[in-house]
Amino acid sequence: MNLHYGLHPATVVALEGDPESRQRIKVRLDWLAATDGGDPPEAWAVIVTPYADADQGFQMLPEVDSTVVVGFLAGHTDHPYVIGSVWNGEADAPERFTDANDKRVIQTRSGSRLEFDDTPGAVAVRISTPGGHEITMDDAGTNIEIAASSGARIELTAAGGVTIEAASTVDVTAAMVTVDAPMSTFNGVVTCDTLIAKGGGVISPMYTPGAGNVW
């Protein structure tokens, strides 16, 4: 029996159908010529991952037809282990390589993306979808921004505290809602269809709608 040590390229053939239900994937060993002159041999390979345990772990499988790197247990080709994937020149990385190496990226086939940006002075974490939705946590601006593809945007910037709590319901439906205040306090029940007070305003411990109904 010929033993094969070291690392070797392989092509992913299938992610399903492991006859032993061991969460292995099928790979084709293109570099290993079949003894009968036929197609290159295929084998079920164990995936090496940073974390694997019962009903938990790090699960990111390579695509069918992608190139992976395999090693063999004690050199036996019938016991391959997939130790990683490679960009083979036909498939590009999601981000261009730079010597500064400021960005770490996880990007899916559709373009959903998690980006860690270590650019000096502009450190940020971004989560985005191919449809244009994005969440940005920006250390440079000390803010958190949620942006929808429609152009809607929520931005949180606070030197103090921002707290929103709801045991049941918080609803805001607007044609226009503007609160710009050194102080706004609401306790108890506030119900109003129309209340317009400018200039002197309304100051009273008791108020009900209607002319003169201020005590």
Name every feature range the model reports, one short phrase each.
Residues T35-T49:
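Short, basic/aromatic beta-hairpin or loop at an interaction surface
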Residues R28-D30, P50, R109-S110:
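A structural micro-motif recognizing beta-strand termini
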Residues Y51-F58:
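Short alpha-helix capping/helix-loop boundary micro-motifs
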Residues A10-A14:
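Generic structural motif
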Residues P19-R28:
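Short aromatic-glycine-enriched beta-strand elements
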Residues H4, P9, P19, Q59-S66, ...:
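Right-handed beta-helix
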Residues L29-A33, V190:
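Short, small-residue-rich loop/turn micro-motifs
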